[in-house]
Amino acid sequence: MKLHELKPAEGAVRAKRRLGRGTATGQGKTAGRGQKGQWSRSGGGVRVGFEGGQMPLARRLPKRGFNNIFKKVYTEVNVEVLNRFENGTEITAELLKSTKTISKIGKDGIKILGEGNLEKALTVKAAKFTASAQEKIEKAGGKAELV
């Protein structure tokens, strides 16, 4: 059997209902919409979230919090992750993204955290380092550079 020989099972495919095409079809005249009213009209219906005039849920619940426009957003990377790179490699946000170590670079760059151990001497360029991360990078013989 080949792909072009595949056919649906007998009786599995039914013709599409053609509405408003004569009374003999059973779906003529009003086409299953009933007589009159909002739902029978073209474009009839209510907007999303409308609850018949009662106060909608979105307005019954209180507003919470705010978005701080000055918030810093970093992609966090632990030093133990950097062990996958060769000795002497210069680690940048772009390198981490291209090697799929991180999925995206935060709006303010990357921040190196001190979780785990680092055995390789690497030059790490990042927007921020924690004190423990910087200590571990320098202890391994590498450099922590702010960009």
UniProtKB/Swiss-Prot annotation:
The keyword RNA-binding applies. Keywords: Ribonucleoprotein, Ribosomal protein, RNA-binding, rRNA-binding. Residues 23-35 have a biased composition (Gly residues). GO terms for molecular function: rRNA binding; structural constituent of ribosome. GO terms for cellular component: cytosolic large ribosomal subunit. SUPFAM superfamilies: Ribosomal proteins L15p and L18e. It holds the Pfam family Ribosomal_L27A. HAMAP family: Ribosomal_uL15. Binds to the 23S rRNA. Part of the 50S ribosomal subunit. This is Large ribosomal subunit protein uL15. It comes from Clostridioides difficile (strain 630) (Peptoclostridium difficile). The gene is rplO.
